[in-house]
Amino acid sequence: MKKDKNKKSKEYFNCWEYSDLKSIIMSNPLLAAEKFKQYIEKYPKDYFSYISYANILLTIGNIKEAENVIKLGSNLANENSNFKNSNKYRDFLESLNYVLLRLLAYNENYTKLYEYCINNPEKIRKNDLNSELLFSKIKCGLINENEISKLSYKASQLFNYDEKLFLEHEKKHLKSEDSSYDTNVSSVFNIDFPFEKVLKEIKRNINLDNKYFYGFFEDKYFFRYDGCGEAFHKNTDYFEVITIHNTNNILTIYPSLDGKFHNNIDLNYILLEDVPTRKLSQIDKFNMRYKK
């Protein structure tokens, strides 16, 4: 009898396979989406997998499919009376609400997002969405003057984007022979990384159709430039560009270990251009160009 029970549980889910799939979401979302689709076909009663799958679809921009998966998973879960009467159903609803909030953010429906955050303070605290509450408030134009001076870098950029502020913020990711840099920063570009040229090409190549949507207010793009820098003490040929959602306003740029399995834009053609005889450090060139 016990064996039959175990056999039945395996028909509903596979915790090992599910865990393996979740582990590749950040590094290879396209493969994760494909694998989750196959997983759901094998285990259609694993309702949480629909939420994970929908989140990935949002990340890669397949919005209609994400909406269909959310609807299908919700309907199947609600049709199962045993599941609805279990403690897991409450957890399922919380996960469902999270992906629905992300959907609101993707569609820039910030008013509904803000109203939900205001009306559900306990859920906001439990799911650590205080930043999302503030950001949605900013997007709705409800921030007051007393709060402006206290805004974090990201919040202030959402409120009123300033490229000079971005350039100053970016210095922590640039190495220099003549000045120290914060060794606590996990991702740093190499000294010979041509930041100015690369930034120009980034602006020229950013295409909203190629974005990845992470979190609630940010888009992410991946670029390749061989030997660009290091991330977590490992050399890498890729870097990430984070922008405010659905805009070309750049929040930060940093080397990444995750670009290999994402759609990325190759900027190695810059390497073929003539290099100056006398090399200046990144920060030297940076200051020469942007110094007031």
Enumerate the predicted regions with their spans.
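Structural motif corresponding to the intra-repeat A-B loop/turn of tetratricopeptide repeats
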Residues: 26-27, 60, 107, 140-142
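Alpha-helical segment of the N-proximal tetratricopeptide repeat
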Residues: 9-38, 42
